[in-house]
Amino acid sequence: MRLLNNLILMVVLFVAVSNATTKFTFNTFSVRNTEDQTCFTKTAKTTDDSTKVDINKCTVGCGGSMKIRKGTKSQQYQFELFSSTDCTGETTSKVLFVCPNPSIDAISIKSTSNTIKCGTLPPDSEIKEDDTATAVVNDENNNETKNEPKTKTKSTPKSPSTPKTNNSNEDSDLTTSSSDSSSSTKSSPKSKSSTEVNENKPKSDNETAEGNNASSNIATFSLVIISLLVASLF
């Protein structure tokens, strides 16, 4: 009877460990634009957020920029691309990817050395963020960096398209998809008669990936439990 109870306990522990959600944290990673210039770097053991973005290097197209927003509660970096479609101030925005995303179905963005796992948002999905998220956008008049509380830009577009926002808890679970991990938009210079929109995947470098090795800790804990159960049988 005692052996049966121990076996049941081991099965319960195994199921609990198998269903545990792995959350990814990133000590250091950087984002490069289509011209292979580093425009954002998150350094280990610092509080770097979107205020550290080199917005001039992230600029794409005509009057556009990449925007990186970090939620202090959810600790998620949301990468967006703001580009002017006709160089007149009319802007469009598109969510590229969210990193890190505590979703089991997170996709992998491979770099030269390591792999970082981020979640992508479907086009029609909502961005779950907290009230304290910060935004950095490119000022088209004087190229200065500004902080804004949400995802809206200060321009008055004819038909703006901004992601929906709402409040979320600390661990927001965003729906992921395996397509379009990142995209960038380019606009032709003024000398051309029309603008061209190209969607490319910006490179992402990650020097140190998963900061907390949840898998190894769970495996160690399971071995200790099994050893104690086996020892109790003798």
Curated annotation (Swiss-Prot):
Residues 154-195 have a biased composition (Low complexity). One of its GO terms (molecular function) is actin binding. One of its GO terms (cellular component) is plasma membrane. Glycans are attached at residues 19, 143, 166, 206, 213. The GPI-like-anchor contains a phosphoceramide group, rather than a phosphatidyl group. Residues 1-20 form the signal peptide. Its main location: membrane. It is a lipid-anchor; GPI-anchor. Keywords: Actin-binding, Cell membrane, Glycoprotein, GPI-anchor, Lipoprotein, Membrane, Signal. It is found in: Cell membrane. The keyword Glycoprotein applies. The keyword Glycoprotein applies. Residues 213-234 form a propeptide. Residues 115-213 are annotated as: Disordered. A lipid is attached at residue 212 (GPI-like-anchor amidated asparagine). Transmembrane segments: none annotated. Belongs to the ponticulin family. Binds F-actin and nucleates actin assembly. This is Ponticulin-like protein J. It comes from Dictyostelium discoideum.
